[in-house]
């Protein structure tokens, strides 16, 4: 089995969510996290764009997305890109 790189966009619940705290929790909870970047959306709201390396075994990408969605302060997490490594 190989690995895939997932690029996910994470939308916080509101502009009041502490993104530095959310980044710290992502680093602690998401195995294979490689990169985190902030992207402005508008009206003071920013999203996070992250890169995660996971196994291409069935269900790994969905499990990663679900784990992120379960974090406090996260409104939505969606895989926007997927590539083989």
Where are these regions (language model features)?
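Long, contiguous binding/interaction regions
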Residues: 1-85
């Amino acid at each position: 089995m190989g690995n895939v790189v997932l690029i996910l966009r994470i939308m916080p619940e509101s502009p009041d969510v502490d993104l530095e705290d959310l980044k710290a929790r992502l680093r602690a909870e998401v195995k294979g996290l490689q990169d985190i970047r902030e992207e402005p959306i508008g009206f003071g709201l920013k999203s996070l764009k992250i890169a995660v390396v996971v196994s291409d075994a069935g269900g790994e990408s969905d499990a990663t997305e679900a784990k992120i969605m379960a974090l406090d302060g996260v409104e939505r997490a969606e895989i926007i890109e997927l590539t083989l490594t």
